[in-house]
Design a protein with these regions (language model features):
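Extracellular carbohydrate recognition
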Residues: 159, 173-189
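Alpha-helical cap/lid subdomain in secreted, periplasmic
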Residues: 114-117, 240-259, 268, 272-404
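Extracellular beta-strand elements of beta-rich domains used
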Residues: 95, 136, 165, 170, ...
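Serine-esterase "nucleophile elbow" of acetyl-processing enzymes
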Residues: 198-263, 276-285
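Extracellular carbohydrate-recognition regions
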Residues: 25-47, 197-202
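Short carbohydrate-recognition loop motifs
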Residues: 53-75
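Extracellular ligand-binding interfaces
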Residues: 70-151, 176-182
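Bacterial N-terminal signal peptides
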Residues: 10-21
């Protein structure tokens, strides 16, 4: 080889090494290299047998850990990490995942070192059977219950307080099919861009979806909610307000093509459903997302100041994940006959958020307090919490009035 070619080769080697060194320098520190198994599988309480397995396999970088669940089993593989204060200096974290090609989702769960009530979820799709990188800003590490504040290194929950790193799927995902996935290299990320341009809509309220309905264009409505909305709840078998809403819209707009998607899950709270959005909302490309929560949240300790904070975050998350496509309609918290005015502060918070974030608003609380002034029990089923036919009709009418 001539001296000039040798110089070119060595120059290429040196340049490549410099590029690699630069890339490595820009990478954040590892949280877990996943070259060893440090998680323990969940155990069935009755049989005391593990609900799944975790094993080493070939990874994206060296080895990785494969997590497998048996059919009809949920829960989490438990594991621990010891973060340092410098976690708070990073924008979030990333990990590599290889799915099983199914439509199900896996989840990372980060839990506070001293209080299990402060636990946070990060869902991920298992659709890809090739390695892909998932990047998560701290703001998208979402508290599962009201005890946890939103993650914010400035004035919220600080990532350096996490101690547990669990892998699995949530109990409230309802379905527990067999699934498996591989995880490799979980590491901190110095910079993660968060798109905020969709958080402030060009057209406020629900004007866009109303125009589509008037024009007879296809419209998809997703109704996020708890047992007051869930089609699977026993109280909603005879009638449910989302179906009555669609019937009312079709009468008002005879040419409208309306698809209804109802991912509501009884017993859940707003934050849990925000975690599940990538599975239950985003794939449907909704034109309208209705948000109906409050009773379970209040039971969990949610009060106005925190409710306002979570609702604002929820509206932004819906707009971000739907890339501004979806109009958002907030429903004020529906009273219960046994809790008639106790949750008014949550409804006050919803009104404030709707005005500030320029969403639509269906004031369900005001409608119920007015209609039930003389005989509120008629709006409910036997437990005086869940809705009877008249209650469902009133919610549907209130939402319909908001879509004018």
């Amino acid at each position: 080889m001539s001296p000039s070619k040798q110089c070119l080769v060595w120059g290429y080697v040196i340049l490549s090494a410099a590029v690699c060194a630069l890339v490595m320098a820009e990478e954040g520190p590892l949280i877990a290299d996943m070259d060893t198994v440090f998680h323990k599988p969940p155990v069935d309480e009755k049989t005391r047998q593990p609900k799944g397995t975790c094993e080493l396999v070939e990874g994206r970088f060296g080895k990785a850990v494969k997590f497998s669940f048996t059919t009809d089993s949920g829960g989490f593989f438990t594991g621990w990490r010891n973060p340092t204060a410098n976690w708070d200096e990073y924008a979030g974290f990333s990990f590599w995942v290889k799915g099983d090609g199914s439509k199900t989702f896996g989840c990372l769960e980060l839990i506070d070192g001293e209080d299990y009530g402060k636990r946070y979820g990060v869902p991920f799709s298992l659709a890809d059977t090739e390695w892909r990188k998932v990047t998560v800003p701290w703001c998208d590490v979402i508290p599962e219950i009201p005890k946890g504040d939103l993650v914010d290194v400035r004035d919220g929950y600080k990532p350096s307080a996490f101690r547990n790193l669990w892998v699995g799927k949530f109990y409230y995902w309802r379905h527990y099919p067999q699934q498996s996935f591989c995880i490799d290299e979980i590491r901190l990320e110095k910079s993660i861009p968060v798109e905020t341009k969709y958080c402030t809509p060009e057209v406020p309220g629900v004007a866009r979806v109303v125009e589509k309905l008037k024009a007879g264009r296809p419209v998809t409505i997703v109704t996020m909610g708890d047992s007051l909305t869930d089609f699977n709840h026993w109280a909603n078998k005879p009638v449910a307000w989302p179906k009555l809403l669609v019937e009312g819209l079709k009468k008002r707009y005879p040419n409208a093509e309306i698809a209804l998607v109802n991912p509501a899950i009884g017993g859940t709270q707003l934050s849990q459903n925000l975690i599940l959005m990538e599975q239950n909302v985003v794939p449907h490309k909704p034109d309208l997302v209705t948000v109906c929560f409050g009773y379970n949240d209040y039971d969990g300790g949610m009060r106005k100041a925190q409710w306002v904070k979570f609702l604002r975050f929820g509206v932004d998350r819906i707009r971000r994940l739907t890339e501004g496509r979806a109009d958002v309609l907030l429903l004020t918290t529906c009273p219960a006959a046994t809790r008639w005015e106790e949750m008014k502060e949550l409804s006050e918070g919803a009104r404030e958020v709707a005005a500030g974030k320029k969403t639509g608003l269906a004031d369900v609380e005001a409608a119920f307090l007015k209609a039930g002034a003389g005989n509120k029990e008629r709006l409910y089923c036997s437990d005086k919490v869940h809705l009877g036919p008249e209650g469902h009709a009133l919610v549907a009418e209130t939402v319909l009035d908001a879509l004018k």
